[in-house]
Every structure is written in structure tokens, then in C-alpha cells.
Curated annotation (Swiss-Prot):
Protein's organism: Schizosaccharomyces pombe (strain 972 / ATCC 24843)
Protein name: Mitochondrial fusion and transport protein ugo1
Family of the protein in this entry: Belongs to the mitochondrial carrier (TC 2.A.29) family.
Mode of membrane association: Multi-pass membrane protein
GO process annotations (BP): mitochondrial fusion
Amino acid sequence: MNPYRPYVVVNNVEPTFSITPEPTFETQPTISKSEIFETLRSILVTKYLTTFFVQPLEVAKTVCQVEEYLPKRTKIERDGKQTKEPYDEDIPDGTEQEGLSDDEHEIYAYFETPTTEKAVTEQLAEKLCVDASGYVTDPSNLIERSYTIHSKRFSIKSIISELWEKEGARGLWKGHTISFLHNLLYSGLQSWLSATLSGALAIADPNIISPIDSVRPLLSLFIKSITSAISALILSPLDIARTKIILFPISSSSYLSSASETSGNSHKKFKPLTIRQCLKALPFYCPSSLILPTVCYVSLPPFVSSVLPLTFRNFLGSSPTLDAMVGLGTSAVQFLLKCPLEMVLRRAQAQYECNLPPQTIVPVGKYTGIVGTIWCLLSEEDPGKFGIEGLYRGWRVGIWGMSSTLALNYISSNLREEVEF
């Protein structure tokens, strides 16, 4: 004890210093290259098999959308099966003119056109064919070839059976490789553009977080629409080549010639139509006539399907039942918009003139702009039973796709819940 500081108690125990352990951070497991390649291979195989199994339905739907289904009356007029025109009844033929007098002969001779004009008229009639609707058509399109298929009206099953009968299995899987490349490149390019643009604007990626759940939904929706449009415009040559390959007959072979060359050049070497030849003949950019239908087909249905749930949530709130009903209605609206726009786009791609053979397995319908093509489908071609069936050709394929997608999502969600449990 210290006499000067009796209040201090001496502790003989040596002081111990508490050592706080350093925090340990959990290190993330390193992903090896083999695992990355294995994941990429599984993704590629899944996408290729999906495209391979769906391709016959897509081929039949494309053929059904592009084919020109004319009413029976118009077909009879095109085939030239009508014997008399209404204005021909008043003009007597040669047998009737025998019993006429000289004055009547002079009257008929005065009103008759000279023989030279008749010859010129016949030459023009041979060069120009005008259908009942007033459009100038190519006479070669009216001639039925051996490779032309004859299917029932708006029947996917009939088109598949005709393709199988005339072209075999190759006819049903035409363009599956280029379809796989287009789908793969489109998904990859759209995801990269979306991630880059959303990172530059400091918002969540619309492919990861839905625009409805985003902090700035309108900006997220704009990014999703603009990236889809840019990706579709960049890959437009692949999409045009896909449509051309599907419509080109496999049973016949043709050569690549310019539009000015005729079919009489039989001494040239024949070549089958391939993907490489299509890409060489097509431009590397989207043609100006296809910009508007491509942008509308890619951007308009997703934009409307994203705006409707956002509007309902702002005005009516959110509940499981309401969200399910809104989701079902949104899918229906997207389907109603997508089918006519897809048909317009396919016809625009089929009518695009390039350095490719003109042969097609079906007569291709007209493309006169988005509104004009829809008007032609409703007024000039066969509209179907309900008047608008012509706008929704191949709708069963779309319904099957939507049903399979919903079923896969339901099964995957149930499996995820079982694994978490």
C-alpha cells in the first residue's frame, strides 16, 4: 500500500489486452472457364432445340400470312373463265352482221377501231395484267408452277401437309438455322444495349426489373422499346433472308440474276438458294420501306402491354386478383396488335425486290403500307367468316405459344417453391 495514496489498490495481476479478431469476409467462389462454357453450351442447345421444334409451325404461319387469299369471284376473273363481259352483249359478232344492210355495215365500220390500234391494245394486254381491284400484276404470277402449294383457307395443318408432300422434311424446316441465329443475336444485342443504356442513365435494367416495378417506369419503358427497335433494325437483313428462304421452293432450283435478266438464259449455271447468297444479295442495313413496319412490330405491342398494367396500378391499386386479370387482358391486347403487324411486316419482306430469284411457293399478297395493307386484307382479299379473320392468320400458333409459355412459367415457379421448401 502506498502511504501517500492509500486509496490506490495495487493489482498484482498483469494487465491483459483484448485482441479483437479481424473481420473475415466470405470470399465468393471463383467460376472456372469450364463452368462458363458448360452454361453457354446448355443455353445454345436449349435455344437451338426450341427453334428446331417450333420451326414447322413458324414456316406454316409465315406462308399463311404472306399468301394472297382472293375471293372465288376474283379468282374466276383472274383465270379468265368468264365467257362474256357485260358490254360485249350489245356488239354483234360476224354471224349476226351477215344479215345487216349496207348502211348498218357502214355504221359499225365507222365505230370500229383500226387494226393497228387493236394490235397495240393486244400487245399492251399481254404485257400488263390488271386484276379486278385495279392493281397491275405480273402475268408470270398467274401461272401455276409445279412447286406451288394449294392449301385450304387459313389452315396451318393444310400448309404443313402440302409442304411435306411436295418438299418433304426439308420444306418444314426451311430457315431454321437463320432463325436460330436471328433469335440468338437479337436477344444478346437487345440485352447488351439495354444494360448499357440503363447504366448510362443510372436506372435498373428493364430486362431484370420490370418497368412497372422500376423507380422511373416511363424511362425504363422507353429504354426497353428503343433497344428493341434498334436491335430489330440492325438484324433486319437476317429477318428478310429468313422470309425469302421460307418462301423459296426447295423442289426447284434457280440462279441468282439481276431483275433485268429474263428466264430465257438457260445456259447459265443453276445454283440453289442458300443463306450466304441471300445475305450477299440483301443490303447490310434495313431498307427504307421496312423501317416503319419493323419498328411498329417490335416496339408497339410491348409498349402497350407495359403501359396498361402501369395505368391500372396507378388508378386502381394492386391486388393479386386484379394483377392476374390485368395480365390476362394485357396479353390479349398484345396478341391482337402483334398478329396484324407481323402479317404486314412479312408481306413487306416478301415484296422487297433484290437480286434474288422471284420464285415463291404461294402467290404473294400486296404490300401498300401498314394502313393500305390492312385495308387490302379486309376489303380486297378474303376476310374470313367474321370479317377480320384475314388479319389474324395463324392465330392458333400464337395461342399455342402463349399457352406453352404460361405453362412453363407455372411449372418452373412450382418447382422453385418445392426446392425452397
